[in-house]
């Protein structure tokens, strides 16, 4: 009853503290720089990670800026089409997940050999993809064919991550399915 709930809450709070230490140690061990503003023109230093405002323990690094526009030529007339991701776009995601420990395991869903079908969900639809970290990463990447690395706390991951209070890093890329 009451005592169990109280102990569970204390255990969760301690696990969150350990999780925050694990994230801090990961950054320290790898010599990453924590920045508080995204670089202008999407030119990121190799070791720069944005501590996303409003999400103190979510970190983002843009590796490759994707395709912001497409130019279509119809009837000899060029049309510029903005490719920014909008809510309900069907996202096709490939990723490599890694633990933040010193001898980390990596699980890869990067190619069709590793995972026949990529992870798909509609951007902004938390019923399809409960991992709020993915939605935030897509928002920050903005454009299809972008690649990034994120470090996210368990509370922003999949339900299994939340329950185990395990933070992960993800190297990810996405496309918008037409």
Spell out what each predicted region is.
Residues 87-101:
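A short beta-strand signature
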Residues 16, 20, 84, 88-91, ...:
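Solvent-exposed, acidic/flexible segments
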Residues 7-70:
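Acidic/polar, low-complexity intrinsically disordered N-terminal segments immediately downstream
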């Amino acid at each position: 009853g009451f005592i169990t709930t109280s102990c569970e809450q204390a255990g969760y709070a301690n696990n969150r503290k350990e999780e925050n230490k694990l994230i801090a140690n990961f950054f320290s061990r790898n010599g990453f720089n924590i920045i508080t503003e995204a670089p202008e023109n999407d030119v990121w230093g190799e070791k720069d990670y944005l501590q996303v405002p409003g999400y103190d323990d979510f970190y983002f690094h843009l590796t490759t800026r994707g395709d912001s526009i497409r130019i279509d030529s119809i009837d000899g007339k060029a049309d510029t089409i903005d490719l920014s991701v909008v809510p309900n776009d069907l996202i096709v995601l490939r990723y490599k997940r890694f633990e933040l420990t010193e001898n980390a395991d990596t699980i890869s869903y990067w190619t069709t050999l590793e995972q026949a079908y990529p992870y798909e969900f509609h951007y902004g639809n938390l019923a399809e993809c409960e991992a709020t970290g993915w939605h935030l990463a897509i928002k920050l990447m903005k454009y299809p064919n972008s690649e990034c690395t994120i470090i996210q706390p368990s509370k922003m991951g999949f339900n299994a991550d939340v329950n185990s209070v395990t933070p992960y890093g993800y190297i990810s890329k996405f496309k918008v399915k037409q």
